[in-house]
Swiss-Prot record:
InterPro entries: GcvP, GDC-P_C, GDC-P_N, GDC_P, PyrdxlP-dep_Trfase, PyrdxlP-dep_Trfase_major, PyrdxlP-dep_Trfase_small. The modification N6-(pyridoxal phosphate)lysine is found at K702. This is Glycine dehydrogenase (decarboxylating). Its EC number is 1.4.4.2. The glycine cleavage system catalyzes the degradation of glycine. The P protein binds the alpha-amino group of glycine through its pyridoxal phosphate cofactor; CO(2) is released and the remaining methylamine moiety is then transferred to the lipoamide cofactor of the H protein. It comes from Xanthomonas campestris pv. campestris (strain 8004). Keywords: Oxidoreductase, Pyridoxal phosphate. One of its GO terms (cellular component) is glycine cleavage complex. The keyword Oxidoreductase applies. The gene is gcvP. NCBIfam families: gcvP, PRK04366.1.
Amino acid sequence: MSQTPSSLRDLEHHSAFVERHIGPNDAEIAQMLGVVGHDSLDAMTDAIVPSNIKSPAALALPDAITEEEALARIRAIASKNQVQRTFIGQGYYGTHTPKVILRNILENPAWYTAYTPYQAEISQGRMEALINFQTMCADLTGMQIANASLLDEATAAAEAMTLAKRSAKSKSDTFFVHDAVHPQTQELLRTRAEPLGIVLRVGTPDEAMQAECFGVLLQYPDSFGHIGDHAALADAVHAQGGLVAVATDLLALTLIAAPGEWGADIVVGNSQRFGVPFGFGGPHAAFMACRDAYKRSMPGRLIGVSIDAAGNPAYRLTLQTREQHIRREKATSNICTAQVLLAVMASMYAVYHGPEGLTRIARRTHRLAAILAAALRSAGVTVGEHFFDTLHVKAIDADAIHAKAHAAGINLRAIDSEAVGISLDETSTRADVVALAQLFGAQADIDALDAATADALPQGMRRTSAFLQHPVFNTHHSEHELLRYMRSLADKDLAMDRTMIPLGSCTMKLNATAEMIPVTWPEFGAIHPLAPPEQSAGYAQLIEELEAMLVECTGYDAVSLQPNSGAQGEYAGLLAIRAYHRSRNEAHRDICLIPESAHGTNPASAQMCGMTVVVTKCDANGNVDVDDIRAKAEKYSDRLAALMITYPSTHGVFEEDVVAICEAVHAHGGQVYTDGANMNALVGVAKPGKWGSDVSHLNLHKTFCIPHGGGGPGVGPCAVKSHLAPFLPKTLPNAGIRAGENQKAAIHGSGSNFGEGEVGMVSAASYGSASILPISWMYVTMMGSAGLRKATQVALLNANYIAKRLSAHYKTLYTGRNGLVAHECILDVRPLEKTSGIGAEDIAKRLIDFGFHAPTLSFPVAGTLMVEPTESESQHELDRFIDAMIQIREEIRAIEDGRLDREDNPLKHAPHTATQVSASEWTHAYPRELAAFPLPSLKQQKYWPPVGRVDNVYGDKNVMCACIPVDAYKDDVVA
């Protein structure tokens, strides 16, 4: 037992959270350092990190504070936000999050700590929830296939534009945009279109009838509430070889005709109003649905149905060859992180309410809107004729109405000096309708108006087709049924509430409960992204403080929090470089050098910026080839725009020549982009902005503790040096935090508010996924300067401890100086395939039998496993993983020695299900006990995968991306 502290400061224990976040205690750290061969964390760090990049001083951040102190501070910040009655709409609507979903999905680490479902066998639960999401979106839109979420509606619309460009027969470069598309979507389309040489034309649907274009984007219902009949326009666009994209509202589609029924080819939208709060703009799960003919050109992830080794239905990610991690610059999109957790919430909202419940919510919302419209008309106010939930109120003194509304604690949409918008939603009440009517001098006798008022849906556009007929949407309507359904899905999966997830380059670290708590506070969740700025003062403070924290951690000068994924942060950073060159009359600089070991998002993002990717080599030691970079920088000197590197490298080492690399690129006029995916090895130790890098994106869902959510949400801030700061993404003027404009400055119509040379928006909301920023603020605040440095050092220690303890069994492919790795290590298992027939995939599947998610498979080197343990894993958990890997090596040795068959062995048939090992007949040459319990400890705590090894080839040949018919399940399959 330690000596009793002698001072009150010691007893107050302000660094308590640091000890909770970091897995090994000081005694374990000392023991592990002994294994690695160093006597202190500082000595080990000096042996790993090149001296010319190490930070000379500690981070200029406050000391650590306790969870309770941090929660009190952020509560005070949140209290500065003003929650008022909001009817702004414009793509964001009030909704009730069912409490059973709030507690058991959003607040449940079994869901929010999971990783992207690349390993199908341990992801069946969340993939079922996602295939429900896909089915929901496809059904409601009337399309044949939908994906498993995109980042927001505006980026989804941009993806629709590029899908249309790839797929349309028309050779036109023009994309026509309905002038009543949401303003934030129009702005983002401008950002995306210009680097790709796409010409945007904005106008009315009538003008679109005559336009020569490869595609059209319509808003349905439109941004001002009108429900148009666009069937004739769809026919006209198709006749000239173009495609029709539609941005829509899922709740409205329960009442109005599905876009797929009147000619749409691609449908996008936001599922936010299915149970997800405003959150000052995000995160929310967008979607894309399309005709089956375009499925291989869709962006984002698709969940499909395949079969497992026993022939039973099993889910998997399908058609992955479309994606950036495989096709790189030829990918359909740079999207990686999406919005899985929010898609799961939206899908459960649909499961809970079912088609009848959703229709009831929609009818009630529409009824209130129709009653309000009738009340306003009775007072002589002009209101649009056909609508679902949004009224376009015209011919008024808008300033006077806004003044009265603000005095009453009501937010309306600013359109122009003579018009306002009013959007009702699930949370709207009779009292709201009365109060809204009074703003215009009208009286609303709700019952009388209800009896006398007809619906405002156009007769020819009412929905008659059925939707959500699968039993999953018609079964779980009691809370017990939904609770048990969600639990059954969670039990099928492996997340960090059960085990470490040792994925290299993914940084699956602790997502502390204290960090998560503020996310569900209404002071953060109930703020509309376009609310008047005085109502978001708390967000203003939070964002300013978090940006300052990130500037200090990185050594850059400015940060944008707008990108809502790491890939979007990359895109923003490359756009900044592009705009910088253009501001210097060097628009011809279009070459982006990218090492062959780079993350797939790097070349995909460069391509989206209109850059030409030139690949550079890696040397035999896994480092980027400095000579090749110098040669290509010189060869393309006049055209060199940028070099993208990852540091520490994707090979898991600190390269010695990073400063020289930066100097070589700068000498030829290029800029250096450092991918921040591996920032967990740098915080408090080294700052990319100080060694010559010009820009980085960060992954707050890696380094700064936002959970991965099974594949999103994420935040990918873009951090830059001062010369690039003018080219960070712009914000909507009425976001208020910096612009200082009041709400009537909101953009509308077809004009852009961005000046010449500025970079437009990269996300729909000015501050992206703002409502999860408190997580990272809490992490930095509770860790403090010393805690952040220690976290980095322990991340380095844990990786080196694994590499050292496994060195007698597996070769670590690359090491840096002194034989050490960075925060991750690559285990080279390729020689084992030659001696035993066992490859990296077999080892990954066998780890499931030990209760582990696999390391990263075949990246950045094919046939290898990349392991990143993070600082949050205890020595006990590291040893458990090491023991599993050693046992697997012994099984491989048994194959090499002939004691196990090369084909009929536990690795080739892994993972093993409970159904399989308990069957009356066992046909394998190895015993059941070896299959199920390869280590004695597994008899105390065992994870059983719900399916056997999933057949990837079958899944890609037989693409099915909707809910499985009930009769497809065999009687003997365990639910």
